[in-house]
UniProtKB/Swiss-Prot annotation:
Catalytic machinery residues: K79 (charge relay system), S154 (charge relay system), S178 (acyl-ester intermediate)
Official protein name in the record: Glutamyl-tRNA(Gln) amidotransferase subunit A
Its EC number(s): 6.3.5.7
SUPFAM superfamilies per the UniProt record, alphabetical: Amidase signature (AS) enzymes
Superkingdom of the source species: Bacteria
Species: Dehalococcoides mccartyi (strain CBDB1)
Length: 486
């Protein structure tokens, strides 16, 4: 008998369309899986069984009437940074512990229109600030491949639930690697679209010039199906770009013969584990065998400055975005004083966790009088240089290939007390956000039983190209089909 929780979107869709299974059966199987595994994995902040079963019933009625789309009846999860009308949205923070949004995020409405089934909201680093999901105010999500290890972050819950077969797909957000890094750590396909490709309306903001919403899926084909559903212009988001939405499934034929791929030397730094480099070299061999040409002598010399640029710009934007949480209109409120200023001060002191407060302070400092020109303006100038280097590279290459992370999934607690060590986890992913590029992380093997991810980077709005490369790689390998023993 078919194990329903192991199905991809495409496989589930075919069975639903042929009426061999129902959405109710598929949804119940995933809810049972969640009930079984959640005590150990802890991927979900909120599970919505009644909502899920109601939506599954509606999907089955639509299918019976011949109204079926690629995501109709497919159980999915959302990172708890996306607003869901009537369903708690916490950002894994005490500040929003009991916040129930009065509206849906744009992507939530689009998925609802497609008939997808919402299983629940996933755990994350508080306000999307972190690389391990240990910064959640509630609990730490565990890596399905080894529950002593972190799943990555900040979208760790969204990655873990797909890896653990608790959901067919999920959505996360990526500000400096928060989709791709946990995708690498959990051995799933994680995609950050071009900046402006997917509306941020209803995404609780961390850093508005860097944030982007994207999917976690079991393979590149599924990723394309989700992108077809969520991409597109939205006039409610000032950063949404009025581009024609491509058919992301177009060209997914496994053929990348003649593609020119560059390998930037700077991404193989001294802190890169040699065994990860070995796996990436193996992956490059696969791509070469598929007919792509590989140039290993690409140089992006400003790459080493990306981490410093990010940790000036992102905290600066966070300082502004998070100033709205003062305990007055919504969210946590310290009310044990009659002094308004003390109430606001205590609200923020008690409502935010240590990492969020650290980044707010860094950002406030960088924006302050006397330091704005020295730090913030200079960082913006270097950001431009990083973007220009990518643009120059893409005049020669169809895509760039790098490791997703310089390290393997690490033990829970290992880096928690060393912010710099934690920040270094994102050295391969941060430059892509700075330049607003599309990038995908796909499974590329294992080292000591722990996953390794391959990152494919594309030029702005050439999202289809990297999807084609990812799909071709997965046609030639089986790493994405491996699942953890749970």
């Amino acid at each position: 008998m078919t194990d329903l929780v192991k199905l991809t979107i495409a496989q589930s869709h075919k069975l639903l369309k042929d009426r061999k299974i129902s959405s109710a059966e598929l949804t119940k199987a995933h809810l049972e899986r969640i009930e079984k595994l959640e005590p150990e994995i802890k991927a979900f902040m909120t599970v919505c069984p009644e909502t899920a079963l109601s939506q599954a019933e509606a999907a089955d009625k639509a299918i019976k009437q011949g109204d079926i789309r690629p995501l109709t009846g497919i159980p999915m999860a959302l990172k708890d940074v996306l607003c869901t009308k009537g369903i708690r949205t916490t950002c894994s923070s005490k500040m929003l512990e009991n916040f129930v949004p009065p509206y849906n995020a744009h992507v939530v409405d689009k998925l609802a229109k497609e008939g997808a089934v919402l299983l629940g909201k996933t755990n994350m680093d508080e306000f999307a600030m972190g690389s391990s999901t240990e910064n959640s105010a509630y609990f730490t999500t565990r890596n399905p491949w080894n529950t002593d290890k972190v799943p990555g972050g900040s979208s760790g819950g969204s990655a873990a639930c797909v890896a653990a077969s608790e959901a067919v797909f999920s959505l996360g957000s990526d500000t400096g690697g928060s989709i791709r890094q946990p995708a690498s750590f959990c051995s799933v396909t994680g995609y950050k679209p071009s900046y402006g490709m997917v509306s941020r309306y209803g995404l609780v903001a961390f850093a508005s010039s860097l944030d982007q919403i994207g999917p976690f899926t079991k393979d590149a084909m599924d990723c394309a199906l989700v992108m077809n559903a969520i991409a597109g212009f939205d006039d409610r988001d000032s950063t949404s770009v009025p581009q024609t939405v491509p058919d992301f499934n177009s060209g997914l034929d496994g053929n990348i013969k003649g593609f020119k791929l560059g390998v930037p030397k700077e991404y193989f730094s001294q802190n890169m584990r040699p065994d990860i480099t070995e796996k990436i070299n193996d992956a490059l061999g696969v791509l070469s065998g598929l007919g792509a040409s590989i140039d290993r002598e690409v140089s992006l010399p400003h790459t080493p400055y990306a981490l410093a640029v990010y940790y000036i710009l992102a905290p600066s934007e966070a300082s502004a975005n998070l100033s709205r949480y003062d305990g007055v209109k919504y969210g946590y409120s310290y009310n044990q004083t009659e002094n308004m200023w003390e109430a606001m001060e205590k609200t923020r002191a008690k409502g935010f966790g240590s990492e969020v407060k650290r980044r707010i302070m860094i950002g406030t400092y960088a924006l302050s009088a006397g330091y704005y020109d020295a730090w913030y303006v200079k960082a913006q100038k270097v950001r431009t240089l990083i973007s220009q280097e990518f643009n120059n590279a893409f005049e020669k290459y169809d895509a760039l290939i790098t490791p997703t992370t310089p390290n393997l999934p690490f033990s829970i607690g290992e880096k928690l007390n060393d912010p710099f060590e934690m920040y270094m986890c994102d050295t391969c992913t941060i430059p892509i956000n700075i330049a607003g590029l599309p990038a995908v992380s796909i499974p590329a093997g294992f080292v000591d039983g722990l996953p390794v991810g391959l990152q494919i980077i594309g030029k702005p709005f050439a999202d289809q190209t990297i999807m084609r490369i990812a799909h071709a790689f997965q046609c030639a390998t089986t790493w994405h089909k491996e699942t953890p023993r749970l």
